[in-house]
């Protein structure tokens, strides 16, 4: 009989608080979230995947039919539902930080900003341009720069800023685990 691995020592210190991964599109939130959740014995949720499942259509189609405002409303509803649960790593959509009311839910957990930097993000986005509704313009790079400038001060509100390069998602997850204790109160000392 296979025994499940012992939970990570941080799990108890986290006290069930959700970890919310934020960052620009293509910053690696989903790919990093899965191994991070596995390492911590947490569940994993991708808000974009939940929205697609509930709407029964892909995000680009939601944007074309409902507009960005309609999508952001759905995103906030999904975030509110997720916020009722605990012990989750949550990969959020890149613009989730743009609605002030979302921060009430985000701040109930720990907010982690994944920042690969502009050049790496543009490289990743060029490889995946068809699935990014906000970049379907004459000048996608200018649209990206505008979005990034608008969101940067909001991403800076995160509890933990993680600079990422070309590391594998497992390595980024380990980096997050390495930095998390700095955000948590020290474990209680046993007198004896």
From Swiss-Prot:
Which HAMAP family does this one have?
Answer: Shikimate_kinase (MF_00109)
Q: What's noted on cofactor binding? A: Binds 1 Mg(2+) ion per subunit.
Q: Which organism is it from?
A: Prochlorococcus marinus (strain MIT 9313)
Which PROSITE patterns does its entry note?
A: SHIKIMATE_KINASE
Q: How does it assemble?
A: Monomer.
Q: What is this protein called?
A: Shikimate kinase
Q: Which UniProt keywords apply?
A: Amino-acid biosynthesis, Aromatic amino acid biosynthesis, ATP-binding, Cytoplasm, Kinase, Magnesium, Metal-binding, Nucleotide-binding, Transferase
- What is this protein's function per UniProt? Catalyzes the specific phosphorylation of the 3-hydroxyl group of shikimic acid using ATP as a cosubstrate.
The family database entries (Gene3D superfamilies) matched by this protein are listed as: P-loop containing nucleotide triphosphate hydrolases (3.40.50.300)
Cofactor(s) demanded: Mg(2+)
């Amino acid at each position: 009989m296979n025994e499940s691995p012992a939970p990570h020592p941080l799990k108890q210190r986290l006290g069930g608080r959700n970890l919310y991964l934020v960052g620009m599109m293509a910053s690696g939130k989903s790919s990093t979230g899965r191994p991070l959740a596995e390492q911590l014995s947490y569940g994993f949720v991708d808000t974009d995947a939940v929205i697609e499942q509930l709407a029964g259509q892909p995000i680009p189609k939601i944007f074309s039919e409902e507009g960005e405002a309609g999508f952001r409303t759905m995103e906030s509803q999904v975030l509110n539902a997720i916020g009722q649960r605990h012990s989750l790593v949550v990969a959020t959509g890149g613009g989730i930080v743009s609605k002030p009311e979302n921060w009430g839910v985000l701040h109930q957990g720990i907010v982690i900003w994944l920042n690969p930097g502009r050049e790496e993000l543009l490289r990743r986005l060029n490889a995946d341009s068809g699935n990014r509704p906000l970049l379907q313009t004459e000048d996608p790079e200018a649209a990206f720069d505008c979005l990034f400038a608008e969101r940067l001060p909001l991403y800076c509100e995160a509890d933990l800023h993680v600079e990422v390069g070309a590391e594998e998602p497992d390595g980024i997850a380990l980096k997050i685990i390495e930095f998390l204790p700095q955000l948590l109160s020290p474990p209680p000392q046993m007198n004896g």
